[in-house]
Amino acid sequence: MSKIKNDKRETGHLKSPPETPLLNRVRFPSDLKQIPEEDLPQLAEELRAEMIDAVSQTGGHLGAGLGVVELTVALHYIFDTPHDRLIWDVGHQAYPHKILTGRRDRIRTLRQEDGLSGFTKRSESEYDPFGAAHSSTSISAGLGMAVARELSGGQRHVIAVIGDGALSAGMAYEAMNNAGALDARLIVILNDNDMSIAPPTGAMSTYLARLASGRAYRGIRDVGKKLTSHLGKSFDRAITRAVEHARGFVTGGTLFEEMGFFHIGPIDGHDLEALVPVLRNVRDNGTGPVLIHVVTQKGKGYPPAEAAADKYHGVAKFDVITGAQAKSPAGAPSYTKVFAQALVQEAREDKRIVAITAAMPSGTGLDLFEKEFPDRSFDVGIAEQHAVTFAAGLATEGYRPFAAIYSTFLQRAYDQVVHDVAIQNLPVRFAIDRAGFVGADGATHCGAFDVAYLATLPNMVVMAAADEAELKHMVRTAADHDEGPIAFRYPRGEGTGVPLPQRGEILKIGKGRIVREGSKIALLSLGTRLADCMIAAEELEAAGLSTTVADARFAKPLDADLIRRLAREHEVLVTVEEGSIGGFGAHVLHFLAHEGLLENGLKVRPLVMPDIFMDQAKPEKMYAKAGLDAAGIVKTVFAALGQAEQAARA
């Protein structure tokens, strides 16, 4: 067991990094294989202590990683990574994996600028054969690798670790169905950390799992294949049925077996004496796809996380001894909270309002809605495609559905947005959280593309909130809009602190607002860059450049009158948005070109997120790097005017 020394940390409690004598001998999985098997439980305890200490300093995903410590040790002990491919679904449980694969010396840089990613990442390590952060992709990727191995005549194993929550997404079943049809050799580890499928039943379950993974039991399947080869394909169905019937006497049939997987388990995912022999047997025996059902506990080994798994899924920095998480200084309410409270307020007035989330009730704020309206709140699981079409179905019957989905996750349901909502002009309301840069979660969670992929659709209305008061207006506007689909986007984090109206106002569709009058420079903002535009306007004014600032509010439909006025009355027009190329600025440029407003010397400069996937950092640093802060806006204006010296100083 690891020990805690006494030493002062910034929390004021006495503690220091844990003692990890066995773990200190392991830099890579090849070192792990030199540890005697009977010492693996101690190594796992040291690995767990190291992870707790690291995440206490960085924040991040804690519970999931603690739940797979023993599984991680066993997988790297038995399989020959990186030659064997080990894929972690989502990747937020991969912190122990990172520690064992040459990244321990950087583990306290998790999710920091220039540090380790909070997820698996191909460019970070050869031990990460497939990057992840969105769920339910591992089996598909693993199957692709397994088929590539067969095509090239290789011998490596491919292992995909997927959680029971991720199995709520259809993609996982599509991959399993394909794997079964191909009869490809693929090992899937089902990490069941909610005991939502079936718990283990003690020693007998472990015995059956160990037996089922060995040669004798797998022989039933092999016998069936040999009979088929001798008797011909006409007998294949009858033989398969007989084999499955024989196996059913031992463990019973399962959905996984119906898909063509050999099913082992459930087994205790924290018992290395059970895990290691089963994984060894699976490694050394059989062909075709196999699923090992492992039951684990989120937060295992850290009492605060065991007692409140939901609160310790993703954590801020925390005190290891007490479990108390660091709290940010009290400030303005978060955009997420303002959205949720505004939606609850509207739902009190309108029984047709229903709320839908795809496994993110807390992240989207809909847990507040669910408390007051449990019968009108729907968590559909990690199933964004279903969420959107489910909302469309509700809309056909006169309800007013709000689908609250992160920008990055709505990408998973784009065809449903197009085919099931926009083409049919159904009034589904999309509350798009985490718009723009999101900080520590990096490129995989960045909300860069929603304006570009939504504003191109006929019938769609797209709004972006400049502050939390505007967000309340947009919730009310969306609730009132029955003419077709409507979306509104807002960022992660706290609002600006502006006074909130008692209730939001219904905005006129396609109309923006002037928030500052000027005569030479026009800054047209979509979203929360408005605050930086106001700061930039002050700096430009001080330099003798009278500046107008406008809040577009709508990316679609555009406020044509506002844009015409800004173009005709100013020398420079800068559009500013928290999105990719092809979004709001592109629509404005298209409009200006079509109207002939680019032919009279107007200097237009669209400011967008750079055409790269930016790694994690603090959001304010990311916006500065992208040139989307006040300094970047000022620099752009000076450059447009040909004032290179001033631009360089900005």
UniProtKB/Swiss-Prot annotation:
Q: Where is this region: Disordered?
A: 1-23
Note one Pfam family from the annotation: DXP_synthase_N
What detail does the entry give on cofactor binding? Binds 1 Mg(2+) ion per subunit. Binds 1 thiamine pyrophosphate per subunit.
Query: Which positions does UniProt annotate for thiamine diphosphate binding?
Result: 92, 133-135, 165-166, 193, 302, 384
Could you list this entry's UniProt keywords, alphabetically sorted.
Isoprene biosynthesis, Magnesium, Metal-binding, Thiamine biosynthesis, Thiamine pyrophosphate, Transferase
Q: Which segments does the entry list as coiled coil? A: none
According to UniProt, this protein's pathway is:
Metabolic intermediate biosynthesis; 1-deoxy-D-xylulose 5-phosphate biosynthesis; 1-deoxy-D-xylulose 5-phosphate from D-glyceraldehyde 3-phosphate and pyruvate: step 1/1
Its needed co-factors are: Mg(2+); thiamine diphosphate
GO BP annotations, alphabetical order: 1-deoxy-D-xylulose 5-phosphate biosynthetic process; glyceraldehyde-3-phosphate metabolic process; terpenoid biosynthetic process; thiamine biosynthetic process
UniProt feature, compositional bias: Basic and acidic residues: 1-13
Q: Which GO terms describe its molecular function?
A: 1-deoxy-D-xylulose-5-phosphate synthase activity; magnesium ion binding; thiamine pyrophosphate binding
What does this gene product do? Catalyzes the acyloin condensation reaction between C atoms 2 and 3 of pyruvate and glyceraldehyde 3-phosphate to yield 1-deoxy-D-xylulose-5-phosphate (DXP).
Q: Which family does it belong to?
A: Belongs to the transketolase family. DXPS subfamily.
Name of the molecule in the record = 1-deoxy-D-xylulose-5-phosphate synthase
Q: Which organism is it from?
A: Chelativorans sp. (strain BNC1)
| Gene, per the UniProt record | dxs
